[in-house]
Amino acid sequence: MTQVTVKELAQEVEAPVERLLQQMREAGLPHTDAGQVVTDNEKQTLLTHLKSSHKSKAEEPRKITLQRKTTSTLRVAGSKSISVEVRKKKVFVQRSPEEIQAEQKREQEERRAAENAAREKADADARQRNEEQARRQAAQAPAAAPVAKAEPAPAAAAPAAPAVPDAPVSEDAAARAAERKKDEARRNESRTRDDDRRGGGVAGERRGEAPRVSIKVKVKEKEKAPTPRAAPRTTDEESDGFRRGRGGKGKPKKRNQHGFQNPTGPVIRDVTIGETITVSDLAQQMSVKGAEVVKFMFKLGTPVTINQVLDQETAQLVAEELGHKVTLVSDTALEDSLAESLKFEGESESRAPVVTVMGHVDHGKTSLLDYIRRAKVAAGEAGGITQHIGAYHVETDRGMVTFLDTPGHAAFTQMRARGAKATDIVILVVAADDGVMPQTREAVQHAKAAGVPLVVAVNKIDKPGADLDRIRNELAVEGVTSEDWGGDTPFVKVSAKMGTGVDELLEAVLLQAEILELKATPTAPGRGVVVESRLDKGRGPVATILVQDGTLRQGDMVLVGSNYGRVRAMLDENGKPVKEAGPSIPVEILGLDGTPDAGDEMSVVADEKKAREVALFRQGKYREVKLARAHAGKLENIFETMGQEEKKTLNIVLKTDVRGSLEALQGSLSSLGNDEVQVRVIGGGVGGITESDANLALASNAVLFGFNVRADAGARKIVEQEGLDMRYYNVIYDIIEDVKKALTGMLGSDVRENILGVAEVRDVFRSPKFGAIAGCMVIEGTVYRNRPIRVLREDVVIFEGELESLRRFKDDASEVRNGMECGIGVKSYNDVKVGDKIEVFEKVQVARTL
């Protein structure tokens, strides 16, 4: 907290110190000296005092006059119109406080007089009621006595005869008295209503006592009266809502009462807390303000903000301390309920094996599959290399086998990893003339990580340089031992070109499948994995699904990762429509709401509501993870990036034909760069380059890359107008090489020094024009004129300058070669000594590389 003295405060507000001390004394502050310290609270007190002392209220107008004028046109016969102007004037007068007090005093006196009158009236009614009660009892007592004596002496009833005429007289008197009370009650009711309008309060309640008494009297007399009448409505009955319709007829209306009542005790809420929850969400569930939760957390010693995320334990502690009931839920509860609903019931049957062909690039994986499928696939791939996962099922003489062909290029690591996870057996293709290569080792690691058995196919065995023993040795180093050497991995010599050994390879694969005893339940709902996905312009999102269990049928509602949809159509690998697909069958499905990621699990769900709920939940989780990764402004990263220069960034908008290629390119391009340059893929997707992609590239100064896709007319128009850089590729090598070249250009160039020659000083001469001249012998390289030099004494640089004069004998020379003598004049330096070395060098710019 910053503290200043009275003198400093006076200088700050530009006021004399004595005047400031006087104002502080008036404000009640204890300061008497200019050197005393003034705290922030005392400043606030002084400011409040000054505001109140200088505040002047403006005279408010006592009378406000409002005038309103409206003009209208009135048409009369003969096509004439008359203008009518209506003026209205309202005057609002503000009364003085004396008038208001006088009126309040007058109202109090009237209220007090009304209370006294009501009290006197109530006393009079009570006395009258007592007198009437006494008269009735006196009139009824003589008549009751002869009745009690009627049994022993019937003649004794004669004295009671004179009392019979008195009964009607008492009833008439009671009726007249009741009529008078009814009129008085009506008058009291009207007075009470008028008093209540002016301000009821306690007096109004007291005024209501007299009508209540009249109600009780009337109820008692109603039992005796021969012709009962309706009791007069009182103020209490009116206030309780017993108002009738016109003329007092109709049913009584229900009282309009306010619905909210303050709770008599604390309200206990059911609070549902996930693994994380924000302070605002927690406060909303407890029906309290967020500031209350923040205040409570401060009391616990944990300063938080209203948007801060709390863990489950902390949120549970806060909710329980505030007296609420807590229910802990897991973030995977929705996923768990989905897993429970997917029941696989039925008899298990044998299924075909799923075989993945893996290996180094150009080792003949696809060519081997071509021979098995009797089709030419490799020729259709750009550059002759596989850039997608291909899924095929083949009917052989020994049964059906499903093959997955994976890319061998280094960029497709994720594709190969997914292929190993979705497979039962891995065929590792190794070229006999090339041996074990980096992607071969990677394929072995993927197979081991997935726990999948290997079958090694030594391809190109018909080539002259084929060496099977070399392959066995190199794979043994990687932990893959041949059966011939006592291991458990079969090695098969094949030639994809000639077809040699293909039958033996299939036999080895089916033998491994029999050992694994692969089972599936065809009657269960379908479950599988996404092999590949793409966005077709005419058909929408298309996903290649490998069914692993159950049966997938057309019309099923499927959940695929964070996407869902109903299967509108299914196609096999040849493009023919099918109605259903059983275990180990790859199919393409149409009808999803987006392109799922390759490797996402597919499952058939019962209804669309469940699928949508889980898909939205997964999308939310993915969005949270993505935002958490992109949030680089965290406190722990601030100090790491402090002092570092900002990297140069190459922004790229990347569109590919399939999801797997997009993932592979994003991973490969993001790994390029160093501490000075980096690649950032700001936009990526599956499908053609659209107008929105071109606008994104324009806004972010990015380069547009299309991999096996093209731009539409709108995108091409924007590219031409704005001069954007858009490039098409169909081979992954080319796009990576071009990005490397672009990053190299962004690095700039380095300045490198090349030593041209070294001369040793043998003697020093004096020249009137140049000063000290060094007589030198060139001992290394060539000495050039007008080049930068360094003077070294005992191999330590003592001066750096420029060679001003170079002579051989008395003639100027442009250069002096090794082993020759010369005279050297150093510009602005005269301290040359015998034994020094003069080093001549040049600075050249060299392009930097990654």
UniProtKB/Swiss-Prot annotation:
Residues 405-408 are annotated as: G3. Residues 136-172 have a biased composition (Low complexity). It comes from Pseudomonas entomophila (strain L48). GTP binds at residues 359-366, 405-409, 459-462. This is Translation initiation factor IF-2. Gene3D superfamilies: P-loop containing nucleotide triphosphate hydrolases, Putative DNA-binding domain, N-terminal subdomain of bacterial translation initiation factor IF2, Translation factors, Translation initiation factor IF- 2, domain 3. HAMAP family: IF_2_B. CDD domains: IF2_eIF5B (cd01887), IF2_mtIF2_II (cd03702), mtIF2_IVc (cd03692). Belongs to the TRAFAC class translation factor GTPase superfamily. Classic translation factor GTPase family. IF-2 subfamily. Keywords: Cytoplasm, GTP-binding, Initiation factor, Nucleotide-binding, Protein biosynthesis.
